[in-house]
């Protein structure tokens, strides 16, 4: 790695250990919890994992900063890593255009169905959302992976959204 270059590291799951060890002058733009072997702090009391479940500690420690998506996200990372380089952007993730789009979709007529994100990613928990709708006798639509605006449009067609994530979504 060029020592005069600054790096922004986002998804480093596939990054080899030797590559992590040579990186200098980098920040981590954290979207979840890659410091845990499970990547899921919800598995632990108060979101605090046992030390043996902490991974990538030195990579986080050596970062110039670790940028988290929300105050809650930062607090969970801080509880587990006890580092002083963790910050929260605590901002709105949506642009004015997306907020306008959401507002327009919210005004559309709604069916008496509920939307469920149809995801193969386990922590999105599609299975329990479907189970819940069946238990409550709710009609539902499974929304398959699709472009973002189409996903929002599909959400806006139904009465509600059923989502039981297994990890804190930021």
Tell where the protein language model's regions lie, with residue ranges:
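N-terminal pre-catalytic "stem/leader" segment of glycosyltransferase-like enzymes
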Residues: 1-17, 21-22, 139
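Alpha-helix capping/helix-boundary segments
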Residues: 13-15, 34, 72-74
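A short, active-site helix/loop in glycosyltransferases that binds the activated sugar's phosphate group
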Residues: 61-86, 125
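Conserved catalytic-core segment of nucleotide-activated headgroup transferases in glycan assembly
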Residues: 93-151
